[in-house]
Amino acid sequence: LLLGDYTEIEEWIADGRVDCGFLRLPTRKDFETIFLEQDNLMVVLPENHPLAECERFPVKALCGDPFMLLEKGAKAEVSEIFERYKLTPNVRFTTWDDYAIMSMVESGLGISILPQLILKRIPYHVVAKELDVPAYRNIGLALKDRKIASLATKRFLKYLHY
């Protein structure tokens, strides 16, 4: 079991280092993919933030606070939001460690955007809000070729449908 960013996982699959990997879709055209889930990207705020009670967080307000950026390598969903809406956030810290970001947000050092799946059952005292614009990632399983996959991978694929 290996942990890496999307680019690393794509390389591992292509090189045969791993049989399959969880990736953001779409991915490389030469991979077979199985869509698993759409995961909303949520704004994460300290509990005492002025917008903690809003129904949906205004995307333009992302530039109003110091921002903790979850990013490593290419294909970063959060940076794509900023590019799409022509925003320049006040990025104070960039890391790939989502728990470090939640701790900094809880301490009032800024705000962030994190995937909703990461925010389930967390010990941090933070507030998660949907953006007022669509923001999500599609998660899927990718592999080179199902027909030549290992027996273990084929059995794993059967369990995905449960």
Cite the ranges covered by each PLM segment.
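Flexible hinge/capping segments at coil-to-helix
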Residues: 30-41, 45-67, 151-153
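Short hydrophobic/charged patches on amphipathic alpha-helices used for structural packing
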Residues: 10, 14, 33, 59, ...
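Extended ligand-binding regions for polar small-molecule ligands
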Residues: 60, 138, 142-162
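Central regulatory/effector-binding core of bacterial HTH transcription factors
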Residues: 1-29, 88, 95
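Short loop/turn segments at beta->alpha junctions
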Residues: 5, 58, 96-97, 115
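Secondary-structure junction motif
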Residues: 65-85, 149-157
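Beta-alpha-beta core module
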Residues: 29-35, 39-40, 54, 99-148
